[in-house]
Amino acid sequence: MKKVEAIIRPFKLDEVKIALVNAGIVGMTVSEVRGFGRQKGQTERYRGSEYTVEFLQKLKIEIVVDEGQVDMVVDKLVSAARTGEIGDGKIFISPVDSVVRIRTGEKDTEAI
């Protein structure tokens, strides 16, 4: 099993969710996060003053899938979340040793 974590622009969430659900993904976790990458924040104006926002609002999507689904999930994330501009985000893939569904006690593949 693998955990796919994607950092995306907030306004892309609906598009990403639809793409993943249509591809058969039945669960995901979404968290509000803040960070910066190459774009290093942005300059904004408020009441005539200019200030720099160093950490930008993003969303983190976490999905645990069988190894055979990873490439498909990554393809769906990239196609749905891409704008072509700096700040589109990143995808991280890491191994998952085990999963337990708390309600039933099911483990691993049956739990996802």
UniProtKB/Swiss-Prot annotation:
Q: Gene Ontology cellular component?
A: cytosol
Output this protein's name.
Nitrogen regulatory protein P-II
Its PTM note reads:
Phosphorylation dependent on the nitrogen source and spectral light quality.
Q: Which of the residues bear the PTM O-UMP-tyrosine?
A: 51
Per UniProt, what is the name of the gene that codes for the protein in this document?
glnB
InterPro entries named in the record: N-reg_PII, N-reg_PII-like_a/b, N-reg_PII/ATP_PRibTrfase_C, N-reg_PII_CS, N-reg_PII_urydylation_site
Q: What domain of life is recorded for the organism?
A: Bacteria
Indicate where the modification Phosphoserine is found in the sequence: 49
Does this UniProt record's set of keywords contain Methyltransferase?
no
